């Protein structure tokens, strides 16, 4: 998201929960004012993203013409400090102030006798269900535009869904 990228730069690369309140909470009045103020910089970033996307399409088409499959990696969880979480807080187990309600991990198993704490917000599945999993569908759709084969990393996060208190 170009807007979150520009805000991150403006606020010295701080995570979104350390931004001023009006931006942390995505106050539309302040965001619209910001977008108007920074319209040229935002347009430049959008053009750069478009150009990179076009270059990727050339690479993908070249690979396809030589019967080469491109493999991508889609993480099950997204970073707490991602544009996805900042833009869609209601879909994640996160308080408006950025603190985690629940965080991800896996219980003890043969890889780790103590389990693993991944530190990423878990999902509010009921909210995803209400949107017919729109966020997920768009996420997969975009990845399949970029690659031919997609590895879902870590499927264990779905098959053995586990969450712990966010303050753990």
What are these regions (language model features)?
Residues 2-4:
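Short, small-residue-biased leader/transition segments that mark boundaries at the very start
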Residues 6-46, 86-128, 162-168:
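Aromatic- and acidic-residue-enriched carbohydrate-binding clefts of CAZyme catalytic domains
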Residues 7-9, 55-62, 129-150:
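An active-site-proximal structural segment forming one wall of the substrate-binding cleft
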Residues 13-14, 146-149, 156, 161:
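Intrinsically disordered or highly flexible coil/loop and linker segments, enriched in small
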Residues 24, 64-66, 71, 145, ...:
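Acidic, mature catalytic/reactive cores of soluble proteins
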Residues 45, 49-78:
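Conserved, well-ordered alpha-helix/loop/beta-strand core segments that scaffold catalytic motifs
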Residues 70-72, 150-153:
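Hydrophobic faces of well-ordered beta-strands that scaffold small-molecule active sites
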Residues 74-82, 117, 156-161:
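Active-site-proximal loop/turn and secondary-structure-junction residues that shape catalytic pockets
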């Amino acid at each position: 998201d170009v807007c979150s990228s520009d805000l991150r730069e403006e606020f010295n690369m701080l995570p979104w929960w350390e931004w001023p309140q009006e931006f942390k909470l995505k106050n539309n009045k302040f965001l619209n004012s910001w977008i108007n103020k920074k319209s040229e910089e935002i347009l430049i970033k959008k053009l750069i993203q478009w150009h990179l996307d076009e270059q990727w399409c050339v690479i993908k088409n070249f690979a396809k013409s030589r019967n080469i499959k491109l493999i991508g990696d889609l993480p099950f969880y997204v970073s707490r400090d991602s544009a996805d979480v900042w833009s869609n807080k209601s879909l994640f187990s996160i308080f408006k102030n950025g603190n985690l309600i629940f965080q991800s991990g896996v219980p003890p198993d043969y890889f780790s006798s103590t389990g693993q704490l991944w530190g990423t917000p878990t999902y509010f599945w009921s909210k995803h269900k209400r949107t017919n999993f729109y966020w997920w569908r768009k996420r997969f759709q975009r990845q399949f535009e970029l690659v031919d084969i997609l590895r879902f990393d870590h499927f264990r996060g779905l098959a053995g869904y586990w969450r712990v208190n966010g303050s753990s």
